């Protein structure tokens, strides 16, 4: 996996005629870093991810199902949380399919899945690189599924379980090479600052912090608090922005 600071060409001589960006003082910006580690490169052996946990309900579907719900391939729709939309039935239909799979979804969980694969992490083992995820889920049928699915990837879930609430889910319909997504945001957007405070010592024990972009817009105060601790200790902070509007929002903040 390429580093953020890896040049396009390892042969420096081939890049001698390419000018590097500079600031108003003529300093080469390509050599700047957000962290001052001195002459030592820190050992980053753990990462904690702050994100919105989503349970993907994935299955192959037929064209008739698309027509029934008046959807288009490539659609990503938000389903009303109160469940009064006609589209609500799509989740039941997907779960009745013989090909249904329950997969940790969302941008952060997808990133952690790739990270686990790259690091060859083993399920429920003490891996050399420790990865955890903090977020909120509902006390429902998806609770155990999402906890087990992350554990199978070698990711330790640190979840606030909200009684009387329901886990965020996304219905994913697949037809040949096309997909559609029906997301219902629920418990994942209600992570409390109290839960963060209760687990603060554990959170800041990690060497790096990975923040999903949606958390910056939905839980800005939590993100700000954790970033202050990680910056104070000169630790690595990673953001993942899914949409340009999130980047604009964060820049303004």
What do the PLM-derived regions correspond to, one by one?
Residues 60, 65, 83, 114-117:
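N-terminal low-complexity, intrinsically disordered patches enriched in charged
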């Amino acid at each position: 996996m390429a580093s953020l600071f890896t040049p396009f060409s390892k042969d420096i001589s081939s890049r001698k005629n390419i000018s590097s960006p500079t600031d108003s003082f003529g300093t080469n910006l390509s050599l700047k870093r957000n962290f001052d580690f001195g002459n030592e490169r820190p050992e980053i052996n753990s990462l904690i991810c702050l994100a919105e946990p989503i349970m993907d309900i994935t299955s192959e579907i037929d064209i008739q199902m698309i027509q029934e719900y008046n959807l288009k391939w490539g659609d990503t729709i938000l389903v009303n949380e109160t469940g009064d939309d006609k589209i609500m039935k799509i989740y039941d239909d997907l779960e009745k399919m013989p090909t249904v799979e329950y997969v940790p979804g969302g941008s952060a969980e997808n990133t952690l899945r790739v990270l686990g694969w790259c690091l060859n992490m083993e399920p429920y083992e003490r891996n050399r690189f420790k990865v955890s995820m903090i977020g909120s889920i509902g006390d429902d049928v998806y609770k155990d599924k999402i906890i087990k699915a992350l554990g199978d990837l070698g990711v330790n879930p640190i979840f606030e379980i909200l009684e009387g609430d329901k886990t965020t889910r996304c219905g994913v319909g697949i037809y040949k090479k096309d997909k559609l997504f029906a997301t219902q945001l629920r418990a994942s957007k209600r992570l409390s600052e109290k839960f963060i405070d209760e687990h603060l010592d554990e959170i800041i024990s990690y060497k790096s912090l990975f923040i999903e972009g949606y958390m910056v817009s939905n839980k800005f105060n939590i993100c700000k608090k954790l970033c202050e601790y990680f910056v104070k200790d000169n630790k690595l902070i990673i953001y993942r922005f899914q949409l340009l509007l999130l980047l604009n929002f964060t820049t303004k903040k």
